[in-house]
Amino acid sequence: MTRPYIKRLSFTLLDSITDKDPMVQEQVCSALCSLGDAQPDETLHACEEYLRQHDKLAHPYRTKILRAMETVLSSHIHDLDKDTAGAVILLATSEMTRTKELDCDWQQAAGSVLVAVGKRFTNQVMEEVLSRFQPGMLPHSSVLHTLANLSVSNAFDMVPFLPSILSTMLPMLSMAKQDALKVVFCGALQHFSESILEYLANLDQAPDPTVRKDTFGADIFGAYDVLFHHWLQSRDAKLRLAVVAALGPMSHLLPSERLEEQLPKLLPAVLGLYKKHAEAFQISKSLGQILEAAVNVSSRTLEVQLDALLVALHAQICVPVESSSPLVMNSQKEVLRCFTVLACCSPDRLLAFLLPRLDTSNERLRVGTLQILRHIINSAAAQMEAKQPFILSSMRLPLLDTNDKVKRAVVQVISAMAHHGYLEQPGGEVMVEYIVQQCALPAEEPEKPGPDGEDLAADSVRAVSIRTLYLVSTTVDRMNSVLWPYLLEFLTPVRFTAALTPLCRSLVHLALKRQEAGADDFLIQYNANANLPSPFAMTTRLLVVSSNPYLGDGRGAASLRLLKVMHQNIHPFLGQRWETTMPMLLEYLDEHTEESLSLKEWEEKLLMFLRDTLAVVSDNIWICQLSQEMCKQLPSYSGTPQEKNFLYKCIGTTLGAASSKEVVRKHLRELLETARYQEEAEQEGLACCFGICAITHLEDTLAQLEDFVRSDVFRKSTGIFSIFKDRSEHEVERMKSCLILCYGHVAAQAPRELVLARVESDILRSMFQCFNTKVLGIKVETKDPALKLCLVQSLCMVSQAMCSSAQASSFHFLRKTELVTQMMEFIRAEPPDCLRTPIRKKAMLACTYLVNLEPALEEQTQADVVHSCLHSVMALPPEAEGGDGVGREPLYLDTVCALEDLLTRLLRQNMTPQGLQIMVEHLSPWIKSPRGHERARALGLGACLLEFFQEHLLVSTLVPFHNLGLLVGLFAPRCADTWTTTRQKAVGCVYSLLYLQLGYEGFSRDHRDDVAERLLTLQDGLVNADPTILFHTCHSIAQVIAKRLPSDQLISLLLTVFESLGDPDKNCSRAATVMINCLLKERGNVLLEKVPEIVSVLRAKLRDTQEEHVLPAAQHSVYLLASQHCEAVVSSLLGSPLPFDSHTCALWRALAVEPGLTAQVLELLLEKMSKDVPFKESRAFLLGSTADRVATLLPLAATCALYEVLSAPSSGTVVLELYPQLFAALLLRVSCTVGVQLPRNLQAKERRSTSPARAARNLDPCSSAVDALQALLLRSGSQDMLRCVELERGWELLKTSAGHEDGVAQLASSMAKYAGPRLPPVTKALACTQNSVYEIQRVTSTAFLAELLSSNVVNDLMLLEPLLDNLTARLKDSSASVRRLVLRGLANMASGSPDKVRAHGPQLLTAMVSGLDDGDEPHSPVALEAMVGLSRLLDLVEPWDLRLVLLHTTIRIRPFFDSEKVEFRTASIRLFGHLNKACHGDCEDVFLEQVVGGLVPLLLHLRDPQVPVASACKFALCMCVPHLECAELAAAFYKYLQEGRSVHFGEFLNSTCKHLMHHFPDLLGRLVSTNLFYFKSSWDDVRAAAPMFTGFLVLHAEPEQKTQVDLEQLIVALQLLLKDPVPGVREKAAETLGRLVKFA
């Protein structure tokens, strides 16, 4: 039976090979391979027979079948019997030669089959193939292909056939006329030759070791003759390439004399092909093989052909490369291989050809030549060794080339030279210097490649050079003597600066190696190496470049490491000390990045290191030599200002350590004479140098400065006609600026006790002498801002130095007023609209220091100082801050800090309330400014002054703070300023003033007042710009002020605040109103006396103005009126036009002020709302089938009014009393307005209304009712309930017909959770509406009551029984929606009262089962609700109660498994799972049959297109599996079917079927037949899963179980699925057919 069965399976699959979907075709082939794995002979026979019978089958499909056969053969060639092999060989040979097309996939597939068979049945294959390879007849091209492939795949078995094949083939060559066939012959000859060469190379393993090359020589030469003399001249490019590809391996098989004879013609011919073919890989490869063959026979022809060879090969290397594809790269490698061959046989001729070409200016030629040179240096090292000097000298011109590609090639050649000892020869240093030069190239961004794709950025050259230098210095030991100490020469020249990092790294490595070798090798003999930098030059250079440590790839750390290693060569005393200090510097760099490092701190650390080094050396001669070297290197850093600045500091430090005054004076004078004054950074550096030097040499420093000012150099520059002489006016100003800065730094750095005596007599005199210019005896004020800035900065340093002196308190500074006046002139001269220079800041700082010195400033002078400084900073535009407090310019912040310091220093002179008031009065115009940024700045300064005053307050006697009210009145209204920062600062000012009052009352400074501390908590409320919160906070602030303000200050406070009513900032005006009202209320009777007058005024304002403070008065009036005429007011307001405008809404809210009045208003509104019908039905068209519901006006107006009254916070008490009635009425109002429209007149009115007084709320009837219900919840304190419903979108659901029930349920759930005690009266109120004539109201009340049962709170409130009775009474309601909700409510007991379910089990189960049979509709929503409810209740009822309904329920829900509606599938399957879970005891026997019957549907519906259904199947399967009592199956289910985890369905199904067939083999037939039902499923994925399920069952079943399966029926069904419109289904069907081989 096996063969017919396999044949049928195979034929069924093969019939589907023509499927249009490629994936299905692939699956068919895969299934065929599966059949072949089990039954290779039968499958191959079936395929062979199918192809013979279906002669007309298109060749693409025949190809696929042949490919499948090849796969089977490759895997099972050793299992194949001879007959099958024979049949396959005949078929494949026939298929291979059926078409005469060349290079066809079909032929290739057939040939591959023959090659696969030929690995074992070589003789049989050769017999059949050679039968089609007859002498005198041109063979089929595929025959040649197959022979060639056989020879490559099985050389040992094929080579013995080759002599006869070659002898037969030779005559055929001349018969071939078609170029395509000639190409095939060439390929065959190439493979034959390669096969022979492989055989000869492995003779020790060959079956016949006697085979010799001579055996093939004659035939190969005969073939060579045809190929070379006839075919190579063809016009067909493909043929020419095929010929040359064959000639390469053939040349190794030619007899030596023949090869020697042919080389003069062969080599030129092959070289000529370069001109005809763009793709040169095959040509170069064959040329290399030919050259190797020629060398092997010691051919003399090469000498003759060498020049032509070199020219052609050189041209190939120099040809522009279009891409970096593997083919192009391989072609280059083959050409270089040719050069290697030539270098080994003719090195002199090769170099004589190459080296002159290095002198060319052509970039490509030079780069190509360098590539060849590098290659032969590496690959022919022995032959090139004697040529090293010659090669080195020829590199002279390439070293001068500026082209980046040439540079890169040169670097690579030098790298190769270094590895082979070239650089040890004379002239090798030049190569090293070249590498260093390339390391010093600028590290630019990579450039975009040019049009030819060849351009390399300079950085790539640099990167290659850096890597080369490091590798050569660290890995090539023979280079140590070349590089050390030679590389040290490159440290100090500026042109090598960019190479310092790689240089230092290499030098560190070399130095450490030398140290290991011994001190003699490491210590440098400077006398013998004149070009090496001295220890002083090296120290200076490495220290200075370390000042910017992250520049140049981190040269700071590299330089310091080199400095540390070189300590013995710098000074013998430094080693031990540097071992301690140097690692600390390096660790500091490691801890920081370029962004986090403070350059100022780093420079200070380096200067400290230098001081420490100088102290350790303690040798004046060495120090003087070091200072001389430092001065000598100054010009080298003209292009790097920061490093030059640091070098100046180093010079100052070194001179400070020198003990020779003559050397110090000499160097200082030279520095002054040679400085580049026009550079600002150099001015600063020179000044720092003089300052540092003055620490130990003050007299000498001042003397040198004085001498220079008097010298001809300076006088010559400052004469009236200097513009025509040596220096321009600009240069003169720069020189003056620098000298002034020098004096400032000298004063700042020198010892304080020495400076004070020299300030007026020397330092200031000289500074102003430089600053003031006289022309013809007349003083001319300078206009140079830089000179001004230097003077101000220096005066600041001088002033600070004077103040910090121990004798400052007794020092009488005569020029104080003059200097302050000068500073004010500078400040007033600054532009008022911008902040560009730090002149303001520096001048104010100078004044701050000067204020402390004697004599004291006059009062008017102080006022002028304050006024000028305030105007200079306050009036700046806000852009000066750089934005709203974020990213402010540091200059602005520093300037404000300087102003604060100056004002507090002036306040310190008069620490009295009067003094504080004077300072605040200066700020007052700015505090009241119409410009917000000016107010914010002024408040900031005010806060600073008050804080300072409070911190330094000393009250010796109890005195009144007489101006407290005035000051508080100035700051308090600013608590509502439109600027947030101003509000915050204003509160801080009030806070400080209240504590100042407490201080004056005698309280200690650390006393904390609870009332005043409230201001800090209120400060947070001012962050929010919401006016309600803002003014409420202002009210609270006013309460605090009222409690702490002395009575005698109240009038002044009120008068001051009343002035703020007209403040340009409207917020402050409103805040003034709030504060006035609060103060009046808190203080007593004033408000009561003024109420009538105030209310009258505000009511009049209501018509004319929209100011917010008017409205409360009008509301109060309405309240008084309603207290006397409640019903009239309510009726009148209800008659207002809808929608209510904002004034009407406000008046409604006023009626909620007093609880008694509020209760009356609410009861009246409830009566009005229920008095009329909620809607009327009308038809838009007389013939319309559906009537529109239109809201009635009175209930609508009452609903809107209820919302306004309930919105008033004061209505809360009354709302709690009337809560049940309000809640029930509003909920039912919501229900009966769902879908209800406005009357047409109101719709049009609402569309037309554009009045600003109109309320923003929507007039929609349902929305109005929902708003009122929300207001009720909010007012009753049920904010949590309100938020809960909002989060679940319950309010939106309430307004829609589709979501209304869910919205009601969410409302009930949240009430049970957050407002449980209110449920009994609410439940009672709603129960009374159960008989409402409106169905929607019955639905709403039932939904609410049903949801309550899901909460446990009904037990606590004794509501369970009443609710059950109420709901069960509605089971016969005429509305299906009501009945459905009743079932939902009964099921809710599972979550709300699970412990009560057992007691009510029969009642609940009866209700649910009756729900399953509700109505005649097959998909009744009541039945769906019953299934969902049963799922929830099953785990909680008595098992006996369940047993009574178990079977009926299971049978009733089974049809829903395959329902078209997803909800029914989900609910029924999940209920099935719960039935399994709840099944106990005897039920298991009854239920096991149902489990087995449901297994297939559940597994297949895991592929259901709906996720909930698949999830339900996971649950049901996990519940079913225990009944099967199979641990392995249970483990698989729990592993794969975890909730939330995606199921790899194929893997899971495979595992499941494996366990099912192992433990339940008798179920095979039943499972397969059930699967057959789903072969016709309407869901594609389920339809695809069914055959897959079947396939896995078959895969894991034992062969003897096949009797359970109707194979005929199954195969027919699968055949039908192979015609399914869905490719995935066809694919699975094909896969399953492949598995049916199991039952063969």
UniProtKB/Swiss-Prot annotation:
Q: One Pfam family for this entry, by name?
A: HEAT_MROH2B_C
Q: Where are the HEAT repeats?
A: 3-41, 218-256, 344-382, 385-423, 575-616, 1357-1395, 1398-1436, 1604-1640
User: What Gene Ontology biological process does one annotation of this record name?
Assistant: lysosome fission
Q: Where in the cell is it found?
A: Lysosome membrane
What GO cellular component is one of the record's annotations?
lysosomal membrane
State one molecular function term (GO): membrane destabilizing activity
Q: Which residues form the signal peptide?
A: none
Q: Which InterPro entries match?
A: ARM-like, ARM-type_fold, HEAT_Maestro, HEAT_MROH2B-like, HEAT_type_2, Maestro-like_HEAT, Maestro_heat-like_prot, MROH2B-like_N_HEAT
The main location class comes to membrane
Arranged from A to Z, the UniProt key words for this protein are: Lysosome, Membrane, Repeat
Q: Which family does it belong to?
A: Belongs to the MROH1 family.
Q: What is its quaternary makeup?
A: Homooligomer; homooligomerizes at lysosome scission sites.
The function of this protein is: Lysosome fission factor. Recruited to lysosomes by RAB7 (RAB7A or RAB7B) at scission sites and homooligomerizes to mediate the constriction and scission of lysosomal tubules. May sever membranes by inserting amphipathic helices into one bilayer leaflet. Lysosome fission is required to maintain their steady-state number, shape, size, composition and function, and to accomplish regeneration.
Report the protein name in the record: Maestro heat-like repeat-containing protein family member 1
Please report the organism this UniProt entry assigns to the protein: Mus musculus (Mouse)
Q: What is the lineage of its organism?
A: Eukaryota, Metazoa, Chordata, Craniata, Vertebrata
